[in-house]
Amino acid sequence: MKRIFIIYIFLLLLGQISVSAQDINRLRERDSNYGNNSIADRNYDTMERDSTEQEEIDASSIPIELHMWNVDERLGTRSPAPVDTIYHLFQNSNLTDGYNGEYNYLGNLGSPRESRIFFNRPSHTQFMFTDPYSAFIIPPEKIMFTNTKSPFTNLTYHKAGSKRDGEDRFKAYFSVNVNKKLGIGFSFDYLYGRGLYASQSTAFFNSSFFGSYVSDHYDLHAIFSFNRLKMAENGGITDDRYITNPLDMEANSKKTPQPSDILTNLSNTWNENKGFYFFLTHHYNLGFERDKDMEAKKKDEKEFIPVTSFIHTLRVDKNERKFISYDKSADIYVHNYFQQDSVKDITKTLSIKNTLAISIREGFSSWAKAGLTGFITHEFRSFTLPDTIPGNRT
């Protein structure tokens, strides 16, 4: 809770600084109307301030205009995303089993999940250990870029349960435009689920930074996202009668067993997935200008019509997965290639993917009813796995 409170205060201060900077720009623009009578040249009195200085910025005068979009991972094609300001189903946005309960999962916030609808399952990545955590990890195509006239902040906090078995999740999103073409922002996500059952807790952290530059001839989008996911493993329950016939277990224990009382195969085992990805896509457009209003023929209003685009996309992924166990493994695993008293399984992967493309744009002429894009992709992959010989890695 202390971390969440500190982050919340930081975001409030950051938003206040951004608003203050825009207020100073407005004052400079206003004072420029007085010619050489700039802010530094004017004689201000600490007690009797100028009447213009006493003007308070009305909330209605703050410009409100927000555009959001995301980009395709392969070619960086922009897709507009209408801003959703409706509270409908907001309470379901934090559920691991999805908005409509279409996912199977292990019962705790952030635990691995799999969609029961086969056609809705995303494609598997090269690092299979993070695929079941689709509720938390944000791929590049789901990062929202913005173009806004005033700083935009979105904070959400979900809480359920008690201090013993409760769940907490705090998310923050902030974006601001430097000018009409350049925008930057970041997102933050912290999840902590204690869980109703033994050895089931989750602690996830994500931080993403993104920026965009969009103009007629050139546009660029960049993302850096870091993830750290730590989850306890229980290996399942020791006796199925806890579920199939709980009355027998109640008779044996002489009390009604609680979820946290159910014995599990593992009690001192966990896994940790840590990694980051860097995504960059940029386009250079060739085209021509024509009158924006073809009927009125207003020569002073021109619009750029792209004809051909040269595209480059880069994605770098680096991930590491640790499986640590201090439970006695001799009675659990059929084949044990590690020490009998502990397990330390570390897997690493590195992927560098480049895509080059040339695109003939749709609609630049009356006969260009469709576009055409050709691309070539090269990907480098490296995997590091533990060897059966202690101390060696392959």
Label each PLM-derived region with a short phrase.
Residues 259-333, 337-394:
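Face-selective signature of the C-terminal outer-membrane beta-barrel domain
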Residues 157-161, 190-194, 215, 226-230, ...:
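Transmembrane beta-strands of outer-membrane beta-barrel pores
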Residues 126-131, 139-174, 195-196:
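Short strand-turn segments of transmembrane beta-barrel domains in outer membranes
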Residues 17-89, 291-301:
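Sec-dependent signal peptide cleavage junction
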Residues 155, 186, 211, 220-222, ...:
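Membrane-embedded beta-strand positions of outer-membrane beta-barrel proteins
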Residues 168-210, 367-383, 394:
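Surface-exposed extracellular loop regions of Gram-negative outer-membrane beta-barrel proteins
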Residues 148, 179, 214-218, 287-289, ...:
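Outer-membrane beta-barrel channels and translocator barrels
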Residues 102-105, 195-204, 210-276:
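Outer-membrane beta-barrel translocator/channel fold
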